[in-house]
């Protein structure tokens, strides 16, 4: 045997071993734990407590964990479109945290991003009206630099939103009976602890149980699948290529069901599937991650890198590039009122028109350093910068329709999540997206050395001080700085601010460079003009010569964001106004 053949055999062995382990697990399915079903929270005033706990992932394998209202994960929150809700999140952890309502269309003050810190032994209580379509969302911590640790420790839960259009369809919706939540994750347990920032995540769990067994009735069953992993992608399917129908993605139902035997689910993504189990009473089957079929460059595939270099320890994880069981199902008797057919149509999906876009923004992913391994390991920058809590990277006008174009100049595929909105995927590396990706999405896969374009509209919420986030949902990448911030600004609310009886007008809006014009009544002569950024820091001071209330200044090198211009007149009156800067 030559050296290349020997190396190939060594690389193949762990993947064959993973398949063997999965098959053995199926043969001894009596040892499988039952699928845990998270309890449900409903109503207009919901209590969540983020707490420490312990969890037994396997006999004699009890580890410290985090959870909402329990030891691991959290309850499923059920909401109705149009209802008002207050979500009271109490933090009993020893650390700072936040809670983000992933995928939901809420104001930036209610979004739960890194600026909405919840200190230990305090409660954060966002209130909002549910505007979203019927879909599957989720919630999880989002503190900058803390997300991967707290999610890995177990802090996450599912959100189900219902609406009148979905309620009118003949679909399974009896929770835990024919409408099953599945939170798919992999964990690494090292030295009796859950390990973070590691490629050793070889423990496969669904709803916190290790490759469990679910009982489902012999009828059409709905599976709400959430990839809650830190990094691993799952190429979903069922044994023997049993068909399923995709009926919904991140932000809502599709226009019609799509028959499939495989579907790629990246971290942060959700998908709703229907499986028709009519006539299968007494049978069993398994959901499989067919990760041997993933293209290289995706974490979970056989290879990440260029064949000469890869992630540290990547080839030591038997799951990488292997097919493995996620969970199995035992088919029981049908319910008294079973769903036995799949509707031919669901709800209209009216995508945004590319011709209506007001602006295209470009985002390029590159490694922070120049070493070859950093093309694989990172940290990764967006447009040449790591996340800075004090920098607003983009300023978006309220009501604008925009194309966001992502270019990935790294050796790793990135799932990119945009807060606030749902978007339509226009193309990926110049090719149309998968047919099941043509609905509403808030996570888009950007392949290694490839690109993706999405289109969306920014409606309803504007805030001149509190940003939304966009970031990679590989949580280690996010924590290391592969994240940016954007403000949504109402242009009609910018430019005039009263100070007592004095007003000032500032233009052009938005400002980029050159002369910034100021006009305010009753000012004459030389006066100091101060510019402050959204955090109150002085970024520019100059003297302007006012003639009959008008003057101009020439600020330079202002980063995109919101600014205040302030002038103290000789009679002690403060004249101020706000303006936005865009590149």
Regions found by a protein language model. Give the residues of each.
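C-terminal outer-membrane/trafficking sorting elements
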Residues: 1-4, 11, 20, 495-583
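Bacterial N-terminal signal peptides
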Residues: 14-26
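Histidine-centered copper-binding motifs that mark active-site loops
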Residues: 31-273, 295, 305-367, 444, ...
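Surface-exposed, short loops/turns at beta-strand junctions within beta-sandwich domains
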Residues: 132-133, 278-281, 462-464, 523, ...
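A short tyrosine-centered beta-strand micro-motif
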Residues: 137, 285, 563-566
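Conserved structural position at the C-terminal beta-strand
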Residues: 143, 289, 474, 567-569
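Edge beta-strands of extracellular beta-sandwich domains
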Residues: 297-301, 484-485, 574-580
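C-terminal substrate/ligand-recognition segments
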Residues: 362-425, 442-465, 471
């Amino acid at each position: 045997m030559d050296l290349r053949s020997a190396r190939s055999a060594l690389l193949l062995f762990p993947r064959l071993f993973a398949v063997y382990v999965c098959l053995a697990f199926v043969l001894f399915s009596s040892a499988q734990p039952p699928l845990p079903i998270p309890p449900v929270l409903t109503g207009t005033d919901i209590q969540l407590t983020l707490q420490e706990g312990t969890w037994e992932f396997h006999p004699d394998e009890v580890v410290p964990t985090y959870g909402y209202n329990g030891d691991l994960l959290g309850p499923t929150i059920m909401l109705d479109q149009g209802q008002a809700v207050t979500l009271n999140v109490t933090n009993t952890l020893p650390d700072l945290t936040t809670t983000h309502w992933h995928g939901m269309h809420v104001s930036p003050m209610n979004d739960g991003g890194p600026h909405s810190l919840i200190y230990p032994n305090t409660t954060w209580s966002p209130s909002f009206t549910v505007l979203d379509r019927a879909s599957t969302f989720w919630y999880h911590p989002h503190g900058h630099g803390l997300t991967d640790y707290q999610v890995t420790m177990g802090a996450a839960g599912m959100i189900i939103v219902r609406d009148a259009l979905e309620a009118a369809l003949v679909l399974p919706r009896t929770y835990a009976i024919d409408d099953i939540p599945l939170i798919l994750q992999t964990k690494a347990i090292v030295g009796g602890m859950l390990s973070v920032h590691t490629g050793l995540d070889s423990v496969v769990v669904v709803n916190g149980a290790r490759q469990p067994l679910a009982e489902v009735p012999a009828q059409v069953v709905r599976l709400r699948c959430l990839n809650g992993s830190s990094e691993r992608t799952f190429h979903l399917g069922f044994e023997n290529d049993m068909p399923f129908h995709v009926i919904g993605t991140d932000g809502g139902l599709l226009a019609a069901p799509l028959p499939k035997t495989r579907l790629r689910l990246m971290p942060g993504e959700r998908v709703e599937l229907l499986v028709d189990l009519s006539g299968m009473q007494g049978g069993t089957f398994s959901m499989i991650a067919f990760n041997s079929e993933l293209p290289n460059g995706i974490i979970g595939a056989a290879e990440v890198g260029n064949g000469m270099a890869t992630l540290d320890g990547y080839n030591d994880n038997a799951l990488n590039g292997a097919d493995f069981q996620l969970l199995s199902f035992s088919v029981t008797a049908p319910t008294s009122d079973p769903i036995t057919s799949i509707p031919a149509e669901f709800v209209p999906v009216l995508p945004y028109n590319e011709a209506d876009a007001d602006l295209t923004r470009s985002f390029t992913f590159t490694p922070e350093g120049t070493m070859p391994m950093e093309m694989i390991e990172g940290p990764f920058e967006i447009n040449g910068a790591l996340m800075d809590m004090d920098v607003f990277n983009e300023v978006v006008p309220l009501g604008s329709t925009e194309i966001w174009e992502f270019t990935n100049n790294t050796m790793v595929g990135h799932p990119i999540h945009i807060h606030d909105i749902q978007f339509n995927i226009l193309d990926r590396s110049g090719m149309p997206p998968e047919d099941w990706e043509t609905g509403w999405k808030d996570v888009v896969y950007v392949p290694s050395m490839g690109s993706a374009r999405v289109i969306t509209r920014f409606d309803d919420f504007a805030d001149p001080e509190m940003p939304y986030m966009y970031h990679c949902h590989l949580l280690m990448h996010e924590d290391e700085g592969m994240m940016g911030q954007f403000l949504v600004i109402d242009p009609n609310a910018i430019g005039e601010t009263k100070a007592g009886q004095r007003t000032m007008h500032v233009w052009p809006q938005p400002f980029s460079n050159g002369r910034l014009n100021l006009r305010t009544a009753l000012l004459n002569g030389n006066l100091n003009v101060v510019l402050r950024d959204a955090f109150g820091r002085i970024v520019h001071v100059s003297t302007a010569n006012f003639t009959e209330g008008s003057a101009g200044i020439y600020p330079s090198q202002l980063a995109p964001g919101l600014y205040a211009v302030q002038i103290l007149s000789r009679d002690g009156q403060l004249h101020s106004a706000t303006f936005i800067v865009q590149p």
